A protein has these predicted regions:
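N-terminal presequence-like segments and adjacent domain-start helices
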Residues: 1-14
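Short, surface-exposed acidic/glycine-rich loop or hinge patches that mediate macromolecular interfaces
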Residues: 11, 21, 49-50, 232, ...
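Short amphipathic alpha-helix segments
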Residues: 11-31
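A short linear hydrophobic-aromatic micro-motif
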Residues: 33-36, 285-286
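Conserved helicase motor core of SF1/SF2 NTP-dependent helicases
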Residues: 42, 97-109, 116-227, 231-327
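Proteins enriched for Cys/Gly/acidic motifs involved in redox and nucleic-acid/cofactor modification
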Residues: 76-107, 119
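Hydrophobic side chains in well-ordered alpha-helices
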Residues: 23, 55-58, 238
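Interdomain "pre-motor" coupling segment immediately N-terminal to P-loop NTPase/helicase cores
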Residues: 29, 36-91
Length: 327
């Protein structure tokens, strides 16, 4: 008789054990010769060495399945322990699975292009309107790379200038000041990583979320780095960000040209970067549009209404300019 401790890593034990420990009870029933005690993320096993080896091998398979799909069903447990390959999930173009087990997939042609560009290039620019899924897809790609151990960390950043607010005038300490700007990034991560695991990742700096200014002076290795709302970077800021790229690192830059909040006297760093970097090998540019919007159907209509208004306003300015020149 031997005793062994098996530590579950990179998964939520609550999902692995099942509701009311149903999964663990099933595993115990399938291994009647072993004494199995599970607490937290540790499984303690006592029994025959040969039986123990088979148990450990199958727990590893179940753990891998749980990490990939964020779920563990009873039929999967039975299939794996009985030596059958579990029936394949309908993965198709699945990037990752949400914490509820729902597949996160590209929901439009241009989102799929973003996924394909990320696979082939080390730097991708994704430009599109609000709700087109560019940031959510980018974060899903980063989470997949982390789960597959292709990288060691995820770094998410945004320039904190939306709505023209100055951080110094906002209440609270630095974390209180910057968190509202970064909340959309937290929201996406919470969809894809169990709360306890996400907290652990952030405490260990495996996942880092910070304003763009905090990137200065760093070299970012073994990471997927995402710069969101890049239209609000200055030319100096985006150059600083892009040159942080280290070994085994991929970058995704997202932005919406219709939501530039910089003072009118400043040029958007994203606009300039698209012009300067066009044609550089290893950099891909993906444009999303209103057809890619996956939010409420009203969002598409709102985007169209603003596009029409801005087009008419531009035409009116040109007309007035021409009239002035003729006088």
């Amino acid at each position: 008789m031997i005793e062994k401790l098996i530590v579950l890593e990179d998964i939520d034990p609550v999902i692995f054990y099942g509701v009311n420990n149903a999964n663990m009870q099933l595993i115990k029933a399938l291994y009647p010769k072993l004494r199995i005690v599970a607490r937290g993320n540790v499984i303690k096993v006592l029994g025959d060495e040969e039986e123990m080896c088979a148990f450990e091998e199958n727990i590893t398979k179940l753990e891998k399945y749980c990490a990939e799909y964020n779920s563990l069903k009873e039929e999967v447990i039975i299939d794996i322990i009985k030596g059958n390959a579990p029936q394949a999930e309908k993965s198709g173009n699945v990037i990752v699975f949400s914490v509820t087990g729902k597949p996160i997939i590209p929901r439009s042609e241009n989102q799929l292009k973003l996924v394909e560009a990320f696979a082939k290039n080390d730097m991708v620019f994704a430009i599109g309107p609000a709700g087109s899924g560019k940031t959510y897809t980018a974060i899903a790609l980063a989470v997949r790379a982390l789960k597959n151990k292709e990288i060691k960390k995820i770094i998410l950043s945004r320039p904190a200038v939306e709505a023209g607010e100055k951080l110094g005038f906002l209440p609270g300490d630095m974390k209180d000041k910057i968190d509202p700007y970064l909340q959309p990034l937290y929201d996406a991560l919470q969809d894809m990583i169990p709360a306890a695991k996400l907290k652990e990742y952030m405490e260990l700096n495996i996942i880092q979320i910070a304003p763009l200014a905090f990137m200065r002076g760093r070299t970012l290795n073994d990471a997927v780095v995402i710069l969101d709302e890049a239209q609000n970077t200055t030319t100096q800021q985006i150059k600083m960000f892009l040159t942080r790229m280290g070994t085994n690192t991929k970058m995704i830059v997202t932005g919406d040209m219709t939501q530039i909040d910089l003072p009118s006297s400043q040029t958007s760093g994203l606009v300039q970067a698209l012009r300067i970097l066009k044609g550089v090998k290893g950099i891909s540019f993906i444009e999303l549009n209103k057809k890619d919007i996956v939010r409420h159907k009203l969002v598409t209509q709102i985007v169209e209404a603003y596009e029409k208004f801005e087009k008419e306003a531009k035409a009116e300015r040109e007309r007035k300019k021409l009239t002035t020149c003729l006088l």
